[in-house]
């Protein structure tokens, strides 16, 4: 352990026929794989810029640990003069996990960090291409005053994204990795007189709406002149969408021909 701080990137079921995400009903495996790899690299690129923090990449199943290794190698080749990327391999550990519900895996990751002696722990998705390094750094910084950092969900709930080691009860009071009632959670924390901070950090992709949301975020960043965000996402996303549209059109034409033939 080189630092008191740790950032855990959780790669939830990257892609595969045995663990289909809802979005795979629309897009085929190979294009979803390329898209999520790009999202992961962008996320890792930003997290690498957070100083004084170790990084752990939790991958399920363990056979996909190559995802983390490949991403580090690829980023190092793409940015050979980048100091933050140059030191990425030395401060990163890859954790292989069994395929289990995300909440169960999150608790396992939390236990690993606590047993390793980390004081400040950030749990976040590995697929957040719109994240900024400042947001992750803020999550760690806020832990100096607040024992718990909550992340909002688009459904109006919340979940635990960061906590201090002196507040292990947070794991049982706040849902980890899944939605829970915002009111119930904040009331429970209030009764225990635990100070918490909310930060928009852990966004994940699991539905078609998520991809559309990310496209809007990338377009907004480009409109406001932020060229750093989405270093490789935009190109891959564009190619991904083009290929998907071609596939959808071909499928539609095929159906029409079949209907005509019949």
Model-assigned labels for residue ranges:
Residues 129-155:
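Conserved donor-nucleotide/metal-binding helix-loop-beta segment in metal-dependent transferases, i.e.
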Residues 36-52:
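A short, N-terminal amphipathic alpha-helix
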Residues 53-63:
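Short beta-strand/loop segment that forms part of the nucleotide-sugar
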Residues 118-127:
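Short beta-strand-to-loop acidic/aromatic patch adjacent to the donor-nucleotide binding site
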Residues 1-23:
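N-terminal nucleotide-binding beta1-loop-alpha1 segment
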Residues 67-119:
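Short phosphate-binding loop-to-helix
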Residues 52, 118, 144-148:
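Short, high-confidence coil segments that cap the C-terminus of an alpha-helix
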Residues 180, 184-262:
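Conserved alpha/beta core of the MobA/IspD/sugar-nucleotide pyrophosphorylase nucleotidyltransferase superfamily
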């Amino acid at each position: 352990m080189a630092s008191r701080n740790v950032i855990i990137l959780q790669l939830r079921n990257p892609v595969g026929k045995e663990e289909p995400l809802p979005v795979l009903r629309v897009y085929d495996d190979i294009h979803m794989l390329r898209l999520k790899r790009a999202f992961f690299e962008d996320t890792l690129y930003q997290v690498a810029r957070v100083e004084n923090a170790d990084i752990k990449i939790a991958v399920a199943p363990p056979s996909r640990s190559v995802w983390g290794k490949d991403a580090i190698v690829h980023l190092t080749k793409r940015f050979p003069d980048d100091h933050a990327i140059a030191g990425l391999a030395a401060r990163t550990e890859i954790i292989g996990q069994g395929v289990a519900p995300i909440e169960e895996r999150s608790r396992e990751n939390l236990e690993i960090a606590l047993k390793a002696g980390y004081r400040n722990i950030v749990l976040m998705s590995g697929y957040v291409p719109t994240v900024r390094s400042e947001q992750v750094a803020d999550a760690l910084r806020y832990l100096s005053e607040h024992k718990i950092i909550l992340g909002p969900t688009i459904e109006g709930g919340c979940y635990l994204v960061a906590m201090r080691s002196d507040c292990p009860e947070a794991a049982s009071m706040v849902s980890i990795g899944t939605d829970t009632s915002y009111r119930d959670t904040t009331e429970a924390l209030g009764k225990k007189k635990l100070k918490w901070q909310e930060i928009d950090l852990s966004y994940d992709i699991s539905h078609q709406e998520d991809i559309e949301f990310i496209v809007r975020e990338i377009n907004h960043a480009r409109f406001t002149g932020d060229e750093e965000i989405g270093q490789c996402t935009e190109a891959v996303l564009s190619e991904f969408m083009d290929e998907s549209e071609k596939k959808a059109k071909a499928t539609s034409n095929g159906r029409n021909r079949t209907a005509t033939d019949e």
